[in-house]
Amino acid sequence: MPLILTIVMVLLVAAGVGGYFLFSGDSADSGAARPANALSRKWEAASPASERAGQNENGLRSMWFNNDDIIYGDGEGVRAYNRKTGKKKWTVKTPKGAGEVCAMSAEPSDDGVGAVVFDAGGDDCSYLSVVDTDTGRTLWSKNLQDGHGAEHQPRVVVNSKVVAVTIGQTYAGFSVGRGARVWELTARGHECTNSVGLSPQYLAVVSDCSDAKPQKQLSLQDLEYDSIHSTVTGEDHAIVRTLSDWPLTLLTESGSTADPVHYIQTYTDKGKPDHTIQLSGELKDLKFEPRNTYVDEDEQILVAGYGATNGLAAMDMKTGKLLWKKRGSAAIAGVNNQGLMIVTDSPDSGASAVKELVVSVGLRDGKEKVKGTLYEKEHNLPAPSDMSVALDRDNMLFIQSERLTDNRPGVQAFEVPFA
């Protein structure tokens, strides 16, 4: 292996000061135009703008949950708010010598540990901080600046044992508890080109080394259990992104950089190649934004963005068949026993796109059931594809977005009925 493993109350929002509005029932949103199925809006909190916000894998649109709180990052740092009331609980401490928050792990570990990356100076997103998501307490921090240029798109993932990063020229894993370096990625030769996929469970590396044998190779390493690893000789597709751990699903590409051919490649739990699907024909319109991509292990279905209007579509991962596609703008909120929960401005019923709807979608048949309308008197919500949305186990829907009227960013909580 080429890897070395040692493995009713209102708090006013003043300029620059965060606050929240707690709504009593639906009284704050009363009005003649209110739809009968309008979802109950529970609270709204300010979310100061950050230049780091975006839909990339580790941008400041991640939302974490613990037992009671929602945790998100913005221009004022990473903070926890009570999910029911919107009251702020804590803020992650900025390490000494660090600046604003750059990035967060897409999710915390099952044990409630998350990773945050701060600006280490000079717009270099290299200061790693690992936190307890129940208390906001910093477990450890590490400045990973390496003097080889500023890092603008750090990647960081967390599991029960390891915090893994690609920051600058550091491709490494650190123990969750103390931050000791437990593995480091090293090249197989002196003349190599590499592409890397990083996820909470796996490190995937495709290497093409003219001075090594085999010249081309895919290496898969389980990040929790160092004894679980495999190699695939002759792999010549470069890794674009890891889409899922269960099953391990890679988006890969080959051909020219100007017009590459993309593939979906899946692997067994033993690290052996399973299915490879070339994205041609209708499948070429699939878009794999990290926050709008979902893989269902049981159904073997992949859901991703689709088309020029930022809709959604589902593909059978065994056959490559496109199962369904949704027009308009849509965003994935989560999955529960009712199906895939999405926010859309263009439901299958053809309803008006003035107010976004929360809809459950059957994974295989694409059938929709409207759960309610996202209603605001001011109609300030943007298109779903411009929101970040997350659904918790209590069917509370959280939306990070900027108001259409004044571009003021904030977070809102809506209650979605189970029935």
How should these model regions be labeled?
Residues 1, 55-72, 100-128, 149-167, ...:
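Repeat-blade elements of multi-bladed beta-propeller folds
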Residues 21-69, 76-102, 132, 137-146, ...:
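Aromatic (tryptophan-biased) beta-strands that constitute blades/sheets of beta-rich domains
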Residues 221-223, 231, 266-267, 274-282, ...:
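Hydrophobic, structured segments
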